[in-house]
Curated annotation (Swiss-Prot):
Residues 427-508 form a coiled coil. This is Cell division control protein 3. The gene is CDC3. PROSITE patterns: G_SEPTIN. The keyword Acetylation applies. GO terms for cellular component: ascospore wall; cell division site; cellular bud neck; cellular bud neck septin ring; Gin4 complex; mating projection base; microtubule cytoskeleton; prospore membrane. There is a cross-link at residues 4, 11, 30, 63, 287 (Glycyl lysine isopeptide (Lys-Gly) (interchain with G-Cter in SUMO)). The record marks 415, 443 as: Not sumoylated.
Amino acid sequence: MSLKEEQVSIKQDPEQEERQHDQFNDVQIKQESQDHDGVDSQYTNGTQNDDSERFEAAESDVKVEPGLGMGITSSQSEKGQVLPDQPEIKFIRRQINGYVGFANLPKQWHRRSIKNGFSFNLLCVGPDGIGKTTLMKTLFNNDDIEANLVKDYEEELANDQEEEEGQGEGHENQSQEQRHKVKIKSYESVIEENGVKLNLNVIDTEGFGDFLNNDQKSWDPIIKEIDSRFDQYLDAENKINRHSINDKRIHACLYFIEPTGHYLKPLDLKFMQSVYEKCNLIPVIAKSDILTDEEILSFKKTIMNQLIQSNIELFKPPIYSNDDAENSHLSERLFSSLPYAVIGSNDIVENYSGNQVRGRSYPWGVIEVDNDNHSDFNLLKNLLIKQFMEELKERTSKILYENYRSSKLAKLGIKQDNSVFKEFDPISKQQEEKTLHEAKLAKLEIEMKTVFQQKVSEKEKKLQKSETELFARHKEMKEKLTKQLKALEDKKKQLELSINSASPNVNHSPVPTKKKGFLR
């Protein structure tokens, strides 16, 4: 064999040896997997205490046996010599088939949730006396919903009214004006059930719909309250220290519809058009026990047609890909049953079967709160609490709040560049921070001006009232003094007349008086 042929054979041998090496590795992997099938089955049957040992063994299973790779050294290949095949390198590969531990993440989340508890902010809107408070007490099975008043927007005005008590008709007119305003009150309570704590915040709207002319002023305070809670959360996110953000955003809005049985009023449609993009809207027909089943079905159909024509979107329970048929059917039923015809009562009555149930007793029978044949109370509880409370909070955070945040920042002139390779410009960053800071200052300035103007107007009213009272008092005293002066003059004239009539013949010439001094 010539030297040229030997060099060609040397160049072809590595390719052949690579193919042989791959075949040998495949056979070796199959053998190793068969050898360790029994060990893995023993591990999965309960021997989970050796996780760390097996993990270390798996890491150290990749071994390289001593030998000459490919059987050819560099010096021999340069000389053109061919050596016999040498023992090849053996690779042992293993996969970790043991228990890693991330399946315990739900348990960790459960433990953390039990420790921290949950929070839920619920807005109740409807006319006074429609049963908002009663339904809240029935939903959460707690009669102390209104025990802790956290925030009252009319508190300052009430304090001013107390200072002005007993000061005339001006106070009565002012208090009458205050009674015709929507008052927003926030109540907080901690409810515990089976070791799970819920921080419940119920926001009530007193005076809604009580105006003779229910224009935009009827729902403006409610919209401002929702926006202010979004602004508070946005300001908390922009702070340096964000570990203690208290979420006060409205997670759901229960709108109470009067049980007229006909159609929605213009006020109902206008309010729901203004609020459905800011919170999860859930309409309910209050006091539905005054309607028959046929009237309820007809009323529901009319309401849904009006909402569709007005392009008002209600909260729709999501259906996930891994949901079974029962959960999917429940989600569809919860949405198709809107608006819910509900009743509220925590009174315990006895039904016809002799069982103690929550409900109301009438001369014609007993209506049960938790009976699906009597009301949609259980559907509302499933949607609001039992099944989709976290979905309500998630939609508020990821959709409604993000839409509000984007529009808010866009109004401030802050735009986002979606390019991936974006250079950091400190000047533009500083300009954005300056814009945000100026917006905050402008907001604070507007709030301070509003408060200042309010205080000034209240002080002016007090001064005007005091001035009016002083003028009235001065006038009254002047008239009184004038009457007294006139009475004294009349009395003087009477005395003079009586003196003249008593001594008619007396000489009224002046009597000379004695002079004092030494010249008398």
